Regions:
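Active-site nucleophile-adjacent alpha helix/oxyanion-hole segment immediately C-terminal to the catalytic cysteine
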Residues: 1-56
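Conserved active-site-adjacent core of cysteine acyl-enzyme catalytic domains
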Residues: 50-166
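Low-complexity, Gly/Ser/Thr/Pro-rich intrinsically disordered linker/tail segments
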Residues: 168-179
Length: 179
């Protein structure tokens, strides 16, 4: 028997990072969300997923699509409003793909984050993972991440198809602020 193994952690093998991204984004905006309320929200969203999906296993194994994430997000925002009386405003990134480059996208995201927002973003390419960006510099995004990633460096990102870098797309970014 090996003397030292690295154990798998919750999230290492499942595709529920989208659920965690929603909860982490809301916790960043609403410090009154404690562990008990976060657990209640997680269960509420998981039950909603189970009820809407005929076969929940593909979501658990392969992850949450952008469409499913948006539906869960609407549910989570109603939950936050009902339970905390806090209205959270969610905004999709409205950027045309034509003439889009990484610097423009990064600048837009940085401006959003600089005005008290957080953003759920999908990282494709080198990974397939929903995460939360909470602040930005010209070269890095600071993350609140269920996989314990702390920063995303712009030099490791692209908007083009890739398998070796992190691909970002404005259609898979949602910005939030407390109203």
């Amino acid at each position: 028997m090996p003397s030292q193994i690295e154990p798998y952690c919750q999230g290492d093998l499942d595709g529920l990072c989208g659920l965690y991204a929603i909860i982490n984004a809301l916790c960043a905006l609403c410090p009154e969300i404690d562990e008990e309320l976060a657990t209640t929200l997680f269960r509420h969203l998981a039950r909603h997923m189970e009820g809407r999906l005929k076969e929940p296993m593909p979501v658990i194994a392969y992850g949450i699509s952008a469409t499913s994430l948006r539906l869960l997000l609407k549910r989570a925002l109603r939950f936050t409003s009902k339970n905390l009386g806090v209205e959270i405003e969610a905004t999709e990134f409205a950027m045309a793909r034509r003439n889009l480059d990484l610097r423009k996208l990064w600048r837009h995201l940085s401006n959003e984050l600089g005005s008290g927002h957080v953003a759920i973003i999908m990282l494709r390419g080198a990974s397939h993972h929903w995460t939360v960006a909470c602040s930005a510099t010209e070269t890095t995004l600071r993350l609140i991440d269920s996989h314990d990633r702390k920063v995303l460096v712009r030099s490791r990102c692209t908007i083009s198809d890739t398998h070796s870098r992190f691909q970002l797309s404005p259609s898979e970014m949602i910005s939030f602020c407390a109203g």
